[in-house]
Regions:
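Bacterial N-terminal signal peptides that target proteins for export
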Residues: 1-10
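Signal peptide processing junction and immediate N-terminal pro/mature segment
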Residues: 20-30
């Protein structure tokens, strides 16, 4: 019968190890270390990557976005909008779908876009070239605002905070090509480098608009100087967090006399505004703009307007325009590595230009009454819970609770679309 002899076996193993060459032992240790180090190193240095390796491999970070639950919902909603627009393009049901379908088809026709080149922006450039004297500047500003290019300042319609059942025209700061007015006046190295790259982008756009090579530097300097003057009169972004700096109703009757060079009375008429009041929350800015219209030569305003029109239209024109815009606005400002796909750009343009129209069609298709009612029920329950918190909470005295209840009673919740109908009367645009 075979018997185990642990001691003899152990001595034999020890002897074998003892007579092995140092080189062979080192080689074995090296091979063992080489095979085990990577896994141990990854787990120790980046445990998140090691623990989530499979999920991260299956869900790579998009080149122009992020991965999140809300992002997934957004992606689904975008696909639904694409399906809706595809149907409107093939077989529109009504005038609104006809307009949306034409917009979608025209935007997706890249061959036609490339063929058109700079033709779509040509009428705007001709309008700017027609400026000869100071009195021509304000009408040119109004004309560009009419087509959605906010030069010198911003102007849009929004809810009247005094009466939520009506809309009001809002004059606001704007007209700048950089996202923060502080970029124009800061002197640190990073900001100077950014402004230098911004000026390079301006040169590209001005060249595409037809400015002669010998005039590019002069035109760029004039446009950048005017933007800097506007930026100096613009409120810092942090101040806009205060709602009182964004809403200040004024009578429209005296605006023409108060801002003679800007001709704001004629501006409002050109935008189709006939209300007796608008919001103008930064009168100092508009006083400066009015002064600049009267003080600066028309040629400087032409350079600025040509640049702003070209920049605004660049994402929708032929490839040289789009590439110039993306190189600065996509890569430099946003850190993107490649532009969004064509369908995404067209969808964004539709939402910008005709968002309420698309939204109403979307709600009619994808928001059934049962879902709307469930959402309204949840909203009502949240309101009831808030009311109970007001009543039971020790933070407010009796007067404070009464004021809170009053505000809550006036809170209106609209799910999907506004309760009142919006006017979608527009001129047909056709395709191409």
């Amino acid at each position: 019968m075979l018997q185990h002899r642990p001691l003899v076996f152990a001595l034999a193993v020890a002897l074998a190890v003892g007579v092995a060459s140092p080189q062979s032992i080192a080689a074995k240790k090296h091979a063992s270390s080489k095979s085990k180090t990577p896994a141990a190193s990854l787990a120790c240095t980046d445990f998140y990557a090691e623990a989530n390796r499979s999920w991260l491999g299956a869900n790579p970070i998009p080149k122009s976005g992020a991965v999140s639950a809300l992002g997934q919902l957004t992606a689904r909603a975008q696909q639904q909008q694409r399906d809706l627009l595809d149907a409107a393009m093939r077989a529109p049901q009504g005038k609104v779908q006809q307009l949306l379908g034409d917009f979608w088809a025209s935007g997706l026709d890249e061959a036609a876009v490339e063929k058109d080149g700079a033709a779509p922006v040509a009428p705007l450039l001709q309008r700017i070239d027609a400026i000869r004297k100071t009195g021509d500047i304000a009408p040119a500003l109004a004309a560009l605002h009419q087509v959605g290019i906010p030069v010198a300042f911003g102007f849009n319609a929004d809810i009247d905070l005094r009466d939520l059942d009506r809309h009001l025209g809002y004059f606001s700061q704007g007209g700048l090509g950089l996202p923060d007015p502080a970029y124009y006046t800061r002197s640190d190295a990073d900001t100077k480098a950014l402004v230098s790259r911004y000026a390079d982008y301006m040169r590209k756009i001005l060249a595409l608009t037809g400015v002669a090579k010998k005039d590019i530097e002069t035109q760029t300097a004039l446009a950048l100087d005017l933007e800097t003057r506007i930026a100096r009169a613009t409120r810092p972004l942090v101040e806009l967090r205060d709602p009182r700096n964004n809403f200040a109703p004024v009578a429209t009757a005296g605006l023409g006399k108060q801002y003679k060079n800007l001709q704001l009375d004629a501006f409002l008429k050109a935008q189709g505004v006939s209300d007796d009041s608008v919001s103008l929350a930064n009168p100092a800015l508009f006083e400066q703009l009015d002064s600049l219209v009267g003080k600066l030569k028309p040629a400087q305003w032409q350079a600025y307007l040509r640049w702003r029109a070209g920049d605004a239209m660049a994402p929708y024109l032929s490839r040289p325009w789009r590439d110039a815009a993306f190189d600065f606005r996509g890569k430099v400002l946003l850190g993107q590595t490649e532009p969004a796909p064509r369908w995404q750009q067209v969808l964004d343009a539709i939402n910008l230009a005709a968002g309420p129209m698309l939204g109403k069609e979307y709600a009619a298709t994808y928001l059934p009454d049962a879902s709307r009612k469930r959402a309204e029920l949840i909203a009502d329950q949240v309101r009831d819970a808030l009311l109970k918190a007001i009543e039971d909470g020790p933070e407010l005295d009796a007067a404070g609770k009464a004021e809170a209840r009053k505000k809550l009673e006036h809170l209106r919740i609209e799910i999907g679309t506004p309760h009142r109908d919006l006017d979608f009367t527009v001129q047909p645009m056709g395709r191409g």
